[in-house]
């Protein structure tokens, strides 16, 4: 994996896309299906040729790139996005320090990869299986991510599964961020450069 600004921007957009979709599902009970498929597929895509290969094409990360450019601001929605991103990255840091959990995560994802022989990627059963990986392996590492939204929407089991599967996708992208050399200082001092890179990518779509 190359450690370039481009690679970091792609990985961070992956986190942003998962978070933006969590917001959509938690609020409305549905979300951008193409972006959802990209984010879910990224969980299972563990041997990509390069960073963008995790997601497919740059256009498949449009929602995440848009969120990176204008979704992280001081509005209530932007503050929520920021909270989710910080929480996911903190959780991934704790997870990566636990070899037992990382090994278990790898095993469970391999099992999910085999299940795609029997289920469509976005089948309810498949989403439920991915949600259970998050619940069983990632969530116990703590701290728990508090998802806010419409109570009646979040009470529905299918939406809970989607949210957890998307949080797992966020963790996948946070792992990728670390693999391509992403550091906290890049978020504090280098975010403007990432925004500029994301704008270039969006402009050529």
Swiss-Prot record:
Bilayer topology term: Peripheral membrane protein
Family statement drawn from the similarity comment of this UniProt entry: Belongs to the HflD family.
The keyword Chloroplast appears for this protein: no
Lineage of source species: Bacteria, Pseudomonadati, Pseudomonadota, Gammaproteobacteria, Vibrionales
InterPro entries cross-referenced by the UniProt entry: HflD, HflD-like_sf
UniProt protein name: High frequency lysogenization protein HflD homolog
Signal peptide per UniProt: none
Any Pfam family the entry gives: DUF489
UniProt keyword annotations, A-Z: Cell inner membrane, Cell membrane, Cytoplasm, Membrane
Localisation per UniProt entry: Cytoplasm; Cell inner membrane
SS bond list: none
Organism: Vibrio campbellii (strain ATCC BAA-1116)
NCBIfam families: PRK00218.1-2 (NF001246), PRK00218.1-4 (NF001248)
């Amino acid at each position: 994996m190359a450690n370039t600004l481009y690679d970091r921007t792609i990985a961070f957009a992956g986190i942003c896309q998962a978070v933006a979709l969590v917001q959509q599902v938690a609020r409305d009970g549905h979300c951008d299906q193409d972006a959802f498929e990209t984010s879910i597929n990224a969980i299972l895509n563990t041997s990509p040729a390069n960073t963008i290969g995790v997601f497919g094409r740059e256009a498949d990360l449009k929602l995440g790139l848009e969120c990176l450019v204008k979704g992280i601001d001081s509005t209530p929605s932007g503050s929520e996005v920021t909270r989710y991103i910080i929480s996911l990255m903190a959780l991934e840091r704790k997870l990566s320090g636990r070899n037992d959990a990382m090994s278990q995560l790898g095993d469970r994802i391999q099992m999910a990869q085999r299940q795609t022989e029997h289920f469509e990627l976005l089948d309810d059963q498949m989403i439920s299986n991915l949600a259970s990986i998050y619940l069983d392996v990632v969530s116990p590492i703590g701290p728990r991510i508090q998802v806010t939204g419409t109570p009646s929407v979040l009470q529905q089991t299918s939406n809970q599964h989607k949210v957890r599967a998307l949080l797992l996708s966020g963790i996948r992208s946070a792992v990728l961020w670390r693999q391509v050399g992403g550091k906290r200082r890049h978020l504090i001092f280098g975010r403007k450069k990432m925004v500029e890179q994301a704008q270039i990518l969006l402009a050529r779509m």
